[in-house]
Design a protein with these regions (language model features):
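Adenosine-phosphate binding glycine-rich loop
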Residues: 230-333
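Short acidic low-complexity segments
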Residues: 180-194, 204-211
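An anion/phosphate-binding loop that grips the pyrophosphate of nucleotide cofactors and donors
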Residues: 194-195, 240
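Short, conserved loop/helix-junction motifs that constitute active-site signature segments
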Residues: 156, 211-216, 235-238
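N-terminal ligand-binding/catalytic initiation module
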Residues: 1-108, 121, 131, 293, ...
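Glycine-rich adenosine-cofactor-binding loop
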Residues: 117-120, 127-169
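Short glycine-/small-residue-rich Rossmann-like dinucleotide-binding loops
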Residues: 201-203, 223-224
Length: 333
């Protein structure tokens, strides 16, 4: 048997956005129903290198298919300036659950961007107003691209407002999407008054307050991925309907981690997990039992999302003879 090696371009080409969104939604369902195993994300802190490693293993049973894998990913903030390397680099090993054979080794950085966008799309589908047609984005880095690509799959987005202190990054983003959307630069408040807002920044001091968003804005808070990171002001969070992806991860390192640790925000302020809404155990925004006002999706990123997205990439690549097959285990086949 051969193991398929897939670089970042291979992952990009084979991670079909609609299929990844469906797969990530299926992962939320499996997790909520207890059909997944996902040990807590483990960290190796390396303060001497201003970085850390994270391991994210998972198994999920989606009913008509199952999948297993592990992502090994880092965050080294000095990399771009000192080593001309990305801040975040990831490697995904995707395995056959029945035999444990490593079916694929793929770039986990591109995979993370794809599944992160897909997670925001799932949340947007359930938590935003059904007729949402405008999207604001705070932070014009690499994650902003997949936010727009994925969310546009679940809502008819026409207007896009992007806000970032780096004018060059904003210009690059506008150039990338100018032919598809009415996209322009704007302030945080202009972005926040769109129907949907995605925040994708690594800040530790909140940059979005209640005055910066509309009465019914849905916010995908995607930037916080470590203790101390915090994009949204406490009073905004406390007045919003908060939906999380996982209680343990969100209270430790998600958007709510800072006010939760301080006792400002408690479990009573959390509406529920996204899986509860996807399976119908709690209502989303739509319907007579749905909620109104501002909503926040606190997304820390789950290993089951990586596994679900990796399956999409592997299956499509394998069917279309993409990637580089090699004899990793030396079985001589």
């Amino acid at each position: 048997m051969q193991t398929l090696l897939l670089n970042s371009q291979d992952v990009d080409e084979n991670a079909r956005t609609g299929r990844v969104i469906d797969a990530v939604e299926g992962a939320f369902v499996a997790y909520e129903r207890g059909d997944a195993q996902m040990p807590p994300k483990s960290y190796i802190d390396l303060p001497e290198y201003n970085g850390d490693f994270r391991s994210m293993p998972a198994y999920m049973d989606a009913g008509d298919w199952d999948a297993a894998g592990i992502k090994w990913v880092n965050v080294h903030t000095d990399n771009p300036d000192e080593y001309d390397l990305p801040t975040v680099m990831g490697t995904m090993i995707y395995s056959d659950p029945e035999t444990a054979f490593p079916l694929a080794i793929m770039d986990g950085t591109e995979l993370t961007m794809k599944r992160t966008g897909a997670a925001a799309a799932v949340a947007t589908d359930y938590l935003s107003v059904p007729d949402a047609d405008s999207l604001g984005i705070v932070g014009a880095g690499v994650q902003s691209y997949t936010q727009l690509e994925a969310i546009a799959e679940v809502r008819d987005i026409e207007e896009v407002v992007v806000s970032d202190l780096d004018e060059e990054r904003v210009a690059d983003f506008i150039d990338a999407f100018a032919d598809e959307f009415d996209v322009r630069a704007g302030s945080i408040a202009e972005a926040g008054h769109c129907d949907v807002l995605s925040t994708v920044t690594p800040v530790r001091d909140p940059i979005v307050g209640p005055e910066d968003v509309g009465e019914h804005t849905h916010i995908n808070a995607m930037g916080a991925d470590a203790a101390g990171k915090h994009e949204l002001a406490d009073d905004l969070l406390l007045d919003a309907t908060i939906v999380i992806d996982d209680h343990e991860q969100c209270t430790h390192s998600g958007e709510i981690n800072v006010p939760y640790a301080a006792g400002t925000l408690t479990d009573e302020d959390i509406y529920g997990e996204i899986g509860e809404i996807v399976v119908g155990n709690k209502p989303g925004r739509a319907g007579e039992d749905g909620f109104d006002g501002v909503s926040v999706f606190d997304s820390t990123g789950l290993a089951i999302q990586d596994v679900a997205a990796a399956r999409v990439v592997y299956e499509y690549a394998d069917d279309n003879d993409n990637g580089y097959p090699f004899d990793l285990l030396g079985l001589g086949e």
